[in-house]
């Protein structure tokens, strides 16, 4: 049986990863995070990397991402790149990801590319108010990615907000399930699992 692919998209810090972690645990699913596919910026200085627009689809290596998603959809394993967020570059190492019966594709642009949507049997959009997303992003990036509060605020105002409005929020139209990122996780899981149950009974894919 072909793997059942689930796309989980939404604005930064809306709760995509939290939902994905719980869903992956419930389904024993493989999880592919789009953050691993940011383009390698080793050719740029550290100052240039710091001002790079990471919030547009062009920031990702979409060719590699699409190829890897297609491989996983066929049941093949991939060598996923490892990205260093402190230096804004790839480490040069990879992590092997084996296909499983269920595969989660999670990230800002999980519903953006038609080629990826075409192999997703369930598409989820997680939405949340901008102020809460910003507060979560400040907390995450200062703790996990070595950023200052000021740099996070500047990035949010210059690229995160406008790019979300241009590229992320419009992909909500493709979602089978729309969730709020501050809802009860058990309730949100139930909504997604119900759609997966229906989709699985019809066969994976679209």
Give short role names for the model-derived ranges:
Residues 16:
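Conserved lysine of the Walker
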Residues 5-7:
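Short hydrophobic/aromatic beta-strand immediately N-terminal to the Walker A/P-loop
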Residues 12:
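The conserved Walker
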Residues 98-99, 139-142, 161-206:
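NTP-dependent small-molecule kinase module
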Residues 30-31, 39, 43-87:
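Conserved nucleotide-sensing/catalytic segment adjacent to the nucleotide-binding pocket
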Residues 25-33:
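Post-Walker A helix-loop "phosphate-sensing" segment adjacent to the P-loop in P-loop NTPases
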Residues 91-144:
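ATP-dependent NMP and nucleoside kinases share a basic, alpha-helical "lid"
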Residues 19, 23:
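Hydrophobic positions on the alpha1 helix immediately C-terminal to the Walker A/P-loop
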């Amino acid at each position: 049986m072909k793997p059942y692919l689930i796309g989980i998209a939404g604005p930064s810090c809306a709760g995509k990863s939290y939902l994905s972690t719980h869903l992956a645990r419930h389904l024993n699913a493989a999880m592919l995070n789009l953050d691993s596919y940011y383009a390698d910026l080793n050719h740029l200085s550290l100052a240039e990397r710091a001002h790079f627009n990471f919030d547009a689809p062009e920031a990702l290596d979409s060719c590699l991402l699409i190829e890897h998603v297609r491989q996983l959809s066929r049941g093949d394993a991939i060598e996923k790149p490892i990205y260093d967020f402190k230096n804004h570059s790839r480490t040069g190492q990879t992590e092997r990801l084996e296909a499983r019966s269920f595969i989660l594709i999670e990230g800002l642009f999980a519903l953006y590319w038609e080629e990826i949507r075409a192999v997703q049997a369930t598409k989820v959009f997680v939405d949340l108010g901008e102020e809460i997303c910003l507060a979560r992003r400040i907390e995450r990036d200062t703790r996990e990615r070595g950023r200052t509060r000021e740099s996070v605020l500047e990035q949010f105002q210059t690229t995160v907000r406008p790019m979300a409005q241009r590229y992320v929020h419009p992909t909500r139209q493709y979602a089978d399930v729309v969730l709020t990122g501050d809802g009860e996780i058990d309730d949100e899981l139930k909504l997604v699992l119900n759609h997966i149950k229906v989709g699985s009974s019809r066969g994976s894919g679209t």
